[in-house]
């Protein structure tokens, strides 16, 4: 049977740490990384070097990348072989500790992540040319600037009051996550025991052999001091400073606010003003071009539609500058028609009112003298007796309606 050759995404040499009878030992493998195709899954194959293959001691391991949970760098505490750097590959079944040449470790991690997590693809020239999809680059402004800051360190717990309360003893993996400091370990691989959000850490420090921090009361572990024995206290300290600095400089996520295009309008609509909602003295005086509230154009005028005092007050204010003397005393409309004889003539006005303001009266029409009155007025050549007689005041009839008017009028 002829086996069809699949295109390899990446190949080279990797070291795998294996558990043996007398401890752990690094073993060198030829590694080949395959991508997903129509008849195969994405996987990492580890085969023995050609020397052992010729002796019949070949060993082949296959890691299915669809079961991969995480890929991360490991500090130098893993004591990897010379000129190599370690990284972990965790799946649902077990945790692999691998080592690649120091110059190639980041390339291996990036290639594995591209195949294991296809939703988080980064621009890879070799992979994009084979797949035929357009080359994509990651936007550094899109909340992924802390991806490269996540690192893991092997630490050993020092007994403190807080660690005893949390029942932490032995060796663990301390990871500087995106938003919290995480502690991984336990009987099952890939178990996160505790996390301490950066905003809840009161203080942290390090020396040559120790890294420590003080957790606040809002942390899941409660407040207290935690100390870890490690040779990489300075690296953990610097990584923690970087992540905190990135979070401080990050812009807050939220919907963009729309720029204001004009003055804000009140949300409550104004209520229609009623002529009885305020006292009469506080109402504004109507202008000549303004309709009185409650009146509609073309509507029949009612007898009590407009108060008389309001109209009179408005007219006095409008024509105050036109009148030469004080305004005439207007009679009270409630009492100006008492004991009025419809047939008797009304008294003449002392002052002329502006045109169009005064009401129509009977004396607006011209009248001719009646009877022989014109003869008496034309007699001008009479004697002194006649002049004296004409200038005298005739007797006033006793039953006249205007006696009260003559009596009320004072001397000028």
UniProtKB/Swiss-Prot annotation:
Annotated stretches, region: Disordered: 250-304, 322-349, 366-412
Modified how: On immunoreceptor stimulation, phosphorylated on C-terminal tyrosine residues. Phosphorylation on Tyr-351 is required for binding to the SH2 domain of NCK. Phosphorylation on both Tyr-276 and Tyr-304 is required for interaction with RASGAP. Phosphorylated on tyrosine residues by TEK/TIE2.
Location of Phosphotyrosine modifications: 276, 304, 351
Protein name (database record): Docking protein 2
BP GO annotations: cell surface receptor protein tyrosine kinase signaling pathway; negative regulation of MAPK cascade; Ras protein signal transduction
Subunit structure: Interacts with phosphorylated RASGAP and EGFR. Interacts with RET and NCK. Interacts (via PH domain) with TEK/TIE2 (tyrosine phosphorylated).
GO molecular function: transmembrane receptor protein tyrosine kinase adaptor activity
PH domain ranges (all copies): 7-117
Annotated source species: Mus musculus (Mouse)
InterPro entries xrefs: Docking_Protein_DOK, Dok1/2/3_PTB, IRS_PTB, PH-like_dom_sf, PH_domain
Keyword entries, A-Z: Phosphoprotein
Gene Ontology CC terms, in alphabetical order: plasma membrane
Domain IRS-type PTB residue range list: 149-254
Matches recorded under SMART domains: IRS, PH, PTBI
Tissue: Highly expressed in spleen and lung.
PANTHER family per the UniProt record, alphabetical: DOCKING PROTEIN 2, DOCKING PROTEIN RELATED
Function: DOK proteins are enzymatically inert adaptor or scaffolding proteins. They provide a docking platform for the assembly of multimolecular signaling complexes. DOK2 may modulate the cellular proliferation induced by IL-4, as well as IL-2 and IL-3. May be involved in modulating Bcr-Abl signaling. Attenuates EGF-stimulated MAP kinase activation.
Protein family according to the UniProt entry: Belongs to the DOK family. Type A subfamily.
Domain commentary: PTB domain mediates receptor interaction.
Keyword Zinc-finger included in the entry's annotation: no
Domain of life: Eukaryota
């Amino acid at each position: 049977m002829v086996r069809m050759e699949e295109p390899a995404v990446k190949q080279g040499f990797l070291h795998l740490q294996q558990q043996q009878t007398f401890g752990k030992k690094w073993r060198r493998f030829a590694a080949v990384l395959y991508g997903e195709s129509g008849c195969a899954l994405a996987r990492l194959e580890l085969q023995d070097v050609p020397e052992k293959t010729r002796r019949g001691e070949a060993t082949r391991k296959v890691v299915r990348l669809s079961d991969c949970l995480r890929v991360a760098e490991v500090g130098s505490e893993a004591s990897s072989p010379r000129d190599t750097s370690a990284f972990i590959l965790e799946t649902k079944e077990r945790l692999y500790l691998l080592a690649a040449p120091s110059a190639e470790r980041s390339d291996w991690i990036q290639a594995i992540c591209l195949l294991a997590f296809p939703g988080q693809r980064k621009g890879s020239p070799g992979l994009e040319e084979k797949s035929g999809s357009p080359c994509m680059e990651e936007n550094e402004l899109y909340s992924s600037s802390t991806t490269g800051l996540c690192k893991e360190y092997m630490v050993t717990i020092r007994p403190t009051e807080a660690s005893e309360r949390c029942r932490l003893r032995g060796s663990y993996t301390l990871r500087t996550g995106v938003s919290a400091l995480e502690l991984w370990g336990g009987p099952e691989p890939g178990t996160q025991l505790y996390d301490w959000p950066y905003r809840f850490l009161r203080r942290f420090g390090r020396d040559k052999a120790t890294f420590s921090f003080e957790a606040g009361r809002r942390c899941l572990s409660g407040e207290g001091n935690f100390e870890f024995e490690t040779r990489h206290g300075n690296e953990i300290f610097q990584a923690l400073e970087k992540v905190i600095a990135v979070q401080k400089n990050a812009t807050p996520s939220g919907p963009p606010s729309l720029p204001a295009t004009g003055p804000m309008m009140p949300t409550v609509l104004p209520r229609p003003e009623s002529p009885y909602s305020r006292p009469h003295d506080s109402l504004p005086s109507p202008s000549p071009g303004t309709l009185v509230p409650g009146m509609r154009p073309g509507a029949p005028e009612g007898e009590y539609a407009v108060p008389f005092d309001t109209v009179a007050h408005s007219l006095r204010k409008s024509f105050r500058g036109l009148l030469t003397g004080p305004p005439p005393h207007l009679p009270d409309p409630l009492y100006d028609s008492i004991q009025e004889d419809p047939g008797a003539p009304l008294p003449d006005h002392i002052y002329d009112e502006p045109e169009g303001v005064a009401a129509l009266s009977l004396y607006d029409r011209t009248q001719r003298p009646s009877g022989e009155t014109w003869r008496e007025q034309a007699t001008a050549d009479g004697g002194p007796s006649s002049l004296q007689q004409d200038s005298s005041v005739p007797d006033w009839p006793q039953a006249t309606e205007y006696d009260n008017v003559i009596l009320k009028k004072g001397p000028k």
